[in-house]
Structure formats: C-alpha cells, structure tokens
Amino acid sequence: MNLNATLIGQLIAFALFVAFCMKFVWPPLIKAIEERQANIANALASAEKAKQEQADSKAAADQEILKAKEEAQKIIDLATKRRNEILETVQAEAEIERQRIIEQGHAEVESERKRVQEELRQKVAALAVAGAEKIVGCSVDQAANNDIIDKLVAEL
C-alpha cells in the first residue's frame, strides 16, 4: 500500500468533492445567505424608516396639539372678551333703565304731590267758605261759592 498513491487519490476525490460543492452546493447556499442578508437589511431599514416616521408623526402630533391649545386659548380669550363686553352693555342698559325708573318715580311723586296740594287747597278753601258761611250766617249760592273758592285757590 502506497501512502502516496492513496493520498493522491484522496486528494483527487476531495478536489472533485470541493469542485462539485463549489459548482452545485455552494451557489444556492450563498444565494440563500445573500437573500437573508438582504431581507435583514431591508427589515432594519424599514424599522429605521418606521422609527423616523414615528418620530416625525409624534413631532407633527405635538405641533398639532400645541396649535389646538393655542386655538383653544384664543377662543377662551375671545369668549371672555365677548362676555365682558356683554356684561358692560347689560350694566350700562341696567343703569339707563334704573335712571329712567328713578326719573319716572320722581315725576310720579311730583305729580302726586301737586295733586294732593291742589286737593288740599280746595279742601282748605271749602273749609274757609264753610267757616265764613257760619260766621256770616247765610249761604251763598253755589256759583258764588265756586268763584270764591277759585280765587282762594289762586291766592294760596
């Protein structure tokens, strides 16, 4: 048994095996590995892109929330301003109405005072005429009575 011939035979068999593997086995394995690497790279890129999109979306959402808060504050400020304007208007109208009612009350009081004063003058005049009739002892006719009362009222 020649060790060299066996070694050469094994070397040839191994070389054929390597050539066979290089030709038929290795390319599909490399292809599968490259596909897997591409899939992993795509998945990582997609994950990174999704992460960036999520960050952008969060920033946009935060911006929208900030805008909404500002808009809500503007609406609240406008409503407060409008409320104050309405309150001022209502208070001014109430003050005008109060003044009108007070003036009307004063006018009514003055009118009532004049009416009572006139009534009192007529009663005083009637009493004066009645007293004068008792003193004189005779009654004057009604027309003369009215003339005397009118003159007394005018003097009072």
From Swiss-Prot:
Topology with respect to the bilayer: Single-pass membrane protein
Coiled coil: none
SUPFAM superfamilies documented for this protein: F1F0 ATP synthase subunit B, membrane domain
Location(s) in or outside the cell: Cell inner membrane
Keyword list, A-Z: ATP synthesis, Cell inner membrane, Cell membrane, CF(0), Hydrogen ion transport, Ion transport, Membrane, Transmembrane, Transmembrane helix, Transport
Gene Ontology cellular-component annotations: plasma membrane; proton-transporting ATP synthase complex
Keyword GTP-binding attached: no
InterPro entries to which the protein is assigned, alphabetical: ATP_synth_B-like_membr_sf, ATP_synth_b/b'su_bac/chlpt, ATP_synth_F0_bsu_bac, ATP_synthase_B_chain
Entry annotated with the keyword Cell membrane: yes
Gene3D superfamilies: F1F0 ATP synthase subunit B, membrane domain
Residue intervals passing through the bilayer: 7-27
Molecular function via GO: proton-transporting ATP synthase activity, rotational mechanism; proton-transporting ATPase activity, rotational mechanism
Functional description taken from the UniProt entry: F(1)F(0) ATP synthase produces ATP from ADP in the presence of a proton or sodium gradient. F-type ATPases consist of two structural domains, F(1) containing the extramembraneous catalytic core and F(0) containing the membrane proton channel, linked together by a central stalk and a peripheral stalk. During catalysis, ATP synthesis in the catalytic domain of F(1) is coupled via a rotary mechanism of the central stalk subunits to proton translocation. Component of the F(0) channel, it forms part of the peripheral stalk, linking F(1) to F(0).
Record note on quaternary structure: F-type ATPases have 2 components, F(1) - the catalytic core - and F(0) - the membrane proton channel. F(1) has five subunits: alpha(3), beta(3), gamma(1), delta(1), epsilon(1). F(0) has three main subunits: a(1), b(2) and c(10-14). The alpha and beta chains form an alternating ring which encloses part of the gamma chain. F(1) is attached to F(0) by a central stalk formed by the gamma and epsilon chains, while a peripheral stalk is formed by the delta and b chains.
Family: Belongs to the ATPase B chain family.
NCBIfam families registered for this protein in UniProt: ATP_synt_b (TIGR01144), PRK05759.1-2 (NF004411), PRK05759.1-4 (NF004413)
Protein name: ATP synthase subunit b
Species in which this protein is naturally found: Actinobacillus pleuropneumoniae serotype 5b (strain L20)
Gene behind this protein: atpF
